[in-house]
Structures are given as C-alpha cells and as structure tokens.
Amino acid sequence: TSNFLRNSRVWPKNAIIVVIPVYNIGGALNRNSTTRTNQNGPKEYGFRGNARNYDLNRDFIKADTRNAHAFIDLFRTVKPDLFIDTHVSNGADYQYTLTHLFTQHNKLGGELAKYLHKALMPQLEDSLQNKALAITPYVNVFNRTPESGFSQFLDSPRYSTGYTTLF
C-alpha cells in the first residue's frame, strides 16, 4: 500500500479519483464563533445543518435532501473501491491531530475486510505515528472518564461511511 501511494508509476491507468470538496456548502457558509460556549476555538466554524437546517451527515439512508440524492447518484455511477469521508468532529476536543474511524471490517466481509483490518489500517496508523502525528481512534465519550471506558462509534447507514458499506 505505501509503495503504491509513493510511486506514481504503479498507479493503474484507469484510476478514477472523485472529490467532493464541500458536501454541506450551506453549513460551511453559515459561520459563527459564539454558539459553542464550552468550546475553546476555532475562531470560526460552520454549522451542522444546511441552508434548510437538514443535518446532511445523517441523511444518507433517508435521502431527504437533494445533496443526498446527488451523492447516491454519484456513488452508484462511480462504484468506488475505496471511500473516504473527512470532516470535523463538531467541536469535540480530542487533543489529537487526527481521530480516525474505519468502518467495522466485518461489515465488508471477505478480502476487502481483511485488507482494511490487516493492511490499510495498520499501515496508515504506523505511517502517521512515524511522522509524529498524534492519532487515535474516534470514540464516543458521552461525558465519561477513561476509567469507565469509551464505545466505538457505529457508522450506521445514516452516515456516509455506513451507507457506502451497503454496496
């Protein structure tokens, strides 16, 4: 995997990369700095809801919005082998450069699950650690202390990462 990413000569000739730079443009443009009183920074942030106040990150399986329909059409057209969703954690203070959430590998099954769990995930984690980037798995904290434990986030089909594992 790391050789594939470093060496441009090994890229397949038919590789297609699709990027959606901002999925929730209405929320991104709705900037504020005072609605999260318990949060120290950032200076400005967007809003979870879109211009019609739909939380687009929780609309994938319901598809109540045009955004979700456009995503579904694009996803079905491209049929990606790999799907990556990056976004902020709504102000949670995790104290890490990056929190990551790989879908539960058993949702994928077969060779893809094995590749995700045994190759891609460990190689990415090791690569970031070797670059001195503090990383940790994304967990639900729900106002609990570390001593009482944390639960892993379940990416159900309402979220992009859960939705995309259905296909």
Spans of features found by a protein language model:
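Active-site/substrate-binding loop(s) of hydrolase catalytic cores
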Residues: 1-121, 125-145
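Hard-cation-handling environments
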Residues: 141-167
